[in-house]
């Protein structure tokens, strides 16, 4: 029996064994959000893109909860846990139903790009309704319970949550692909990082999504301090780091830190994205 099929091994060991059987081209294909099937291993294609900020209604009928900013206004941690439970239950049901029919299209997977724990500092920001407000403390407390509800506490993760957008991503929306957010270390650690730290160290969130913008001069999807020193170094994050949609393209088209798509991809991969 191939090592990657041995259920006595950990998921990490099986994934590593499978990766060892793939060519460089096959491995690269798996980095796309719409990863193709690996037929020789009997694995179907998988689409990593699913949303779950306040429901999973993009793939059929589902419970639509109020926007995140409205949920947060209740200041109810237990409610946030229950909301997360419902969302992941419905996501799991949709996934199971789709899988029976070989449907691996967008919004059918178990990787939910939620919650958005950015700090809603400026009310003119167009995505503030996705957040839990302007205060890092309730954002942290509510975010932890939401992630715990999404991921569950069973031997197999119910669905995977993703803390986004790391970090200092709170507008201006029209410039998100090119602006450079300048934040002092004091502001970073008092305002913008506490919620991410809580979700990683307390809730064991499975994924973190990098923001489009730069923070203090470096793209958030290839940021040594944020990704290597803080996330994986200080907080010991062991999950996967994903870019926001097509954010790597911004490296050479807007941030001008690289010249070609190949250079941008290499920069992101070498940084751990």
Where are these regions (language model features)?
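Glycoside hydrolase catalytic-domain context in secreted enzymes
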Residues: 1-273
């Amino acid at each position: 029996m191939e090592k990657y099929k041995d259920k006595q091994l950990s998921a990490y060991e099986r994934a590593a064994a499978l990766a060892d059987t793939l060519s460089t081209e096959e491995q690269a294909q798996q980095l796309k959000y719409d990863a193709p099937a690996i037929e020789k291993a009997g694995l179907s294609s998988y689409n990593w893109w699913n949303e779950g900020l306040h429901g999973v209604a993009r793939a059929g009928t589902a419970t639509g909860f109020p926007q995140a900013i409205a949920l947060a206004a209740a200041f109810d941690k237990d409610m946030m846990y229950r909301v997360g439970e419902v969302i992941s239950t419905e996501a799991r049901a949709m996934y199971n139903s789709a899988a029976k029919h070989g449907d691996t299209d967008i919004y059918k997977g178990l990787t939910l790009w939620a919650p958005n724990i950015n700090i809603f500092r400026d009310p003119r920001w167009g995505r503030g309704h996705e957040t839990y407000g302007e205060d890092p403390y309730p954002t942290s407390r509510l975010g932890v319970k939401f992630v715990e509800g999404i991921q569950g506490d069973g031997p197999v993760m119910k669905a995977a949550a993703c803390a986004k957008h790391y970090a200092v991503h709170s507008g201006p929306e029209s410039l998100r692909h090119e602006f450079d957010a300048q934040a002092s270390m004091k502001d970073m650690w008092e305002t913008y990082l506490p919620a991410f730290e809580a979700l990683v160290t307390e809730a064991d969130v499975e994924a973190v999504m990098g923001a489009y913008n730069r923070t203090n001069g470096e793209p958030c999807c290839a940021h040594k301090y944020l990704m290597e020193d803080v996330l994986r170094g200080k907080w010991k994050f062991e999950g996967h780091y994903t870019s926001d949609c097509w954010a790597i393209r911004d490296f050479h088209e807007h941030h001008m830190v690289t010249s070609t798509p190949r250079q941008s991809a290499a920069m992101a991969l070498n940084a751990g994205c």
